[in-house]
Amino acid sequence: MLIILVNGTAAWGCRLVSGRFALVPVRDLKTHEAAQPDRVRRVMKQMRSTGVVKKAIVVDSKSKVVLDGVHRLNALKSLGAVRVPAWLIDYSDDAVLVFSKDRKSQISKDSVVRAATLGPKFPPKSTRHMTKAKDGSLVPLSRIEAEISVPLSDLLRSH
């Protein structure tokens, strides 16, 4: 997969989703979905093994709701991280869409923010945040996230 970042914008045959990269304090982030403990443990093991975080989470810049990366966030929290690499985007942008897991029904962005701020959370892996490719097909935001290499040690309390 080829990802091009131009002035903080990711393009992958899609309408552009603008954003910026930042290290965000863990305490500021809110999740709208529950996490699967086994998956969190697998992600933790991989992060410990490599010593780096290879993919930023996707976060709404305004509400600080995690749109993609709940398991990565929970793994980082469990490892003692106080900062998380994040791709901050404007969730109100029409280019960002949210669907149910099966992609058959659209979910409102308001319900995602409500679940994160007031509860209850959605079940694990139940929402899919997408954008449209130039051909009209849906592309998960996770497919247009740039790979990164942030040392785990840079995110921990002791740093």
Segments (PLM) and residue ranges:
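Short alpha-helix boundary/capping and kink motifs at helix termini
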Residues: L2-K62, N74-K77, A81-I89
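Basic- and aromatic-enriched surface patches that contact anionic nucleotides/nucleic acids
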Residues: A35, S49, V65-H159
